[in-house]
A protein has these predicted regions:
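Juxtamembrane membrane-water interface segments immediately C-terminal to a transmembrane helix
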Residues: 7, 21-47, 62-66
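Short, hydrophobic beta-strand elements of compact beta-sandwich sensory domains
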Residues: 158-175
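Short amphipathic alpha-helical segments
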Residues: 68-79
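A short beta-strand signature within small-molecule sensing/ligand-binding domains used
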Residues: 142, 152-161
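Extreme N-terminal signal-anchor transmembrane helix of membrane signaling/transducer proteins, especially
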Residues: 1-25
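Short N-terminal helix-loop-first-beta-strand/juxtamembrane motif that initiates sensory/input modules
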Residues: 80-106
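Amphipathic coiled-coil signal-relay and dimerization helices
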Residues: 20, 101-112
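Extracytoplasmic/periplasmic sensor domains and loops in membrane signaling proteins
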Residues: 110-148
C-alpha cells in the first residue's frame, strides 16, 4: 500500500504541475493574441487617418471643424467594425504629446460622441499614456506588457504613431 500511495501522490503532483504549465502557456498565448489584435487595429487606424487633417486639428483645436469630424468618423468606423463577440474595442482616440511637458499626452481626437460622458475633448490629459510608458515608445508600434488600469477599468491597449508625408512624427493612435 505504501507503493500505491506513493504512485498516487506522484501522479497527482505530475498532473498538477502539467496543468499549471498548460495554464501558464495558454494565458501567455491569449495575452499575445490580445496584444496582436490591439496593435493591428491601432496600425490600421494610423494608416487610415489623414495626417494633413490632423495637422489642421492641431492648429484649430475645434471639435466642430470638418477635419475633426472627418477624423472622428474614421476612428468611429474602425471602432465599430471591431466590436465583435471575440474582440470589443471600447475606445479609440488620437493623442498628442503635450508641448514642454515630457511624458504627458493630451487627447486630440476622440471617437466617442461629444455628448457622451466618456468623450475626451481636445487638450484633456490622457493619463493612461503615462502609466503605459508611451513616451518611451513614442515612435514605435507599442502595447504595454500588462493590462492597464485607469478610471475607466482594466484594458489591453495598443498604440501606433502617425507620421507626416515627409516622415516626421505627428501624433499617436490609441486603442
Amino acid at each position: 500500500t505504501k507503493l500505491y500511495v506513493a504512485l498516487v501522490i506522484t501522479a497527482v503532483i505530475s498532473t498538477v504541475i502539467s496543468l499549471s504549465i498548460i495554464h501558464i502557456q495558454a494565458k501567455k498565448l491569449l495575452l499575445e493574441e490580445l496584444h496582436t489584435n490591439v496593435v493591428s487595429i491601432a496600425v490600421n487606424a494610423a494608416s487610415e487617418v489623414d495626417p494633413k487633417m490632423i495637422q489642421q486639428v492641431q492648429l484649430n483645436k475645434n471639435v466642430n471643424s470638418l477635419e475633426y469630424t472627418a477624423t472622428q468618423n474614421v476612428l468611429r468606423k474602425i471602432r465599430d467594425d471591431n466590436r465583435r463577440e471575440n474582440l470589443f474595442v471600447k475606445y479609440i482616440y488620437i493623442i498628442d504629446p503635450a508641448h514642454n511637458k515630457p511624458n504627458q499626452f493630451n487627447y486630440l481626437v476622440d471617437a466617442e460622441e461629444k455628448t457622451s460622458a466618456d468623450f475626451s475633448p481636445i487638450g484633456e490629459s490622457a493619463d493612461e499614456a503615462i502609466s503605459a510608458d508611451l513616451s518611451g515608445h513614442l515612435k514605435q508600434i507599442y502595447s504595454p506588457a500588462n493590462f492597464a488600469t485607469d478610471a475607466w477599468g482594466e484594458w489591453m491597449t495598443g498604440y501606433a504613431p502617425i507620421y507626416t508625408s515627409d516622415g516626421k512624427y505627428l501624433v499617436t493612435v490609441g486603442v
